[in-house]
Regions:
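Conserved N-terminal alpha-helical segment that immediately precedes and caps sugar-phosphate-binding
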Residues: 1-207
Length: 207
């Protein structure tokens, strides 16, 4: 797949199966494993991922009202910022920026603060490119069930971190094959830009 990303749309599922000495059923199972609805969906997504999708000012506009509303609601509450792997240092940056601007922010998850009794007193911010990391999904699902307000910065719209949050902020586009270090991954850099833009808009609104 990686060797033929420029002409994937010309390869049928039978050709793909034959070239890899497997069956079409195995290809379908692979598609499902990666979260695609079928072979055509996988090919479309992989072909589209060749072009890096950057966040635009027009994309930002749709998130501003809800972002401002949530920060106003939790101005004096605890804000937990969390990410795993490459998202961890991004979460640390967001936490420090919030703290410097007077918020009660931390980047360590205390699960008791995501209990239902804190549903009006906690805001949970998560960063994840894929949105499918099991431990992160478990934490977010529990917070969602307890009616905790959640903001997610995420690339994968087909994940729980998009479905089960108060405000999902889509950053770029998700590629299941981003493990290839030769392919540029702009997600983490874009999260910083998007967050800074949203925070600036919020701070400007309360001056």
């Amino acid at each position: 797949l990686e060797d033929n990303q420029n002409n994937l749309k010309d390869i049928t599922i039978r050709q793909m199966a034959s070239a890899n000495f497997t069956s079409t059923s195995a290809i379908y199972r692979l598609c499902n494993k990666f979260g695609f609805s079928g072979y055509s969906d996988m090919i479309y997504q992989l072909s589209s991922s060749n072009n890096t999708q950057l966040f635009s000012p027009d994309d930002l506009e749709q998130y501003i009202p809800a972002f401002i509303e949530l920060l106003n609601k939790h101005r004096q509450h605890n804000i937990i910022v969390f990410g795993m792997g490459f998202s961890a240092p991004i979460a640390d940056y967001l936490q420090q920026r919030l703290t410097l601007n007077g918020f009660y922010a931390m980047n360590v998850v205390h699960t008791e603060m995501l209990d239902i009794k804190y549903q009006d007193n906690s805001l949970f911010i998560v960063i994840s490119n894929s949105g499918i990391t099991p431990r992160l999904v478990e934490i977010v699902d529990n917070a969602f069930k307890n009616n905790i307000d959640i903001i997610s910065f995420i690339a994968n719209e087909n994940s729980n971190l998009y479905q089960n949050v108060t405000l999902p902020i889509i950053v770029g586009s998700y590629n299941s094959f981003t493990h290839n270090n030769l392919v540029p991954n702009t997600f983490f850099g874009q999260v910083l830009i998007v967050f800074e833009s949203l925070l600036y808009t919020y701070l400007s609104s309360i001056e």
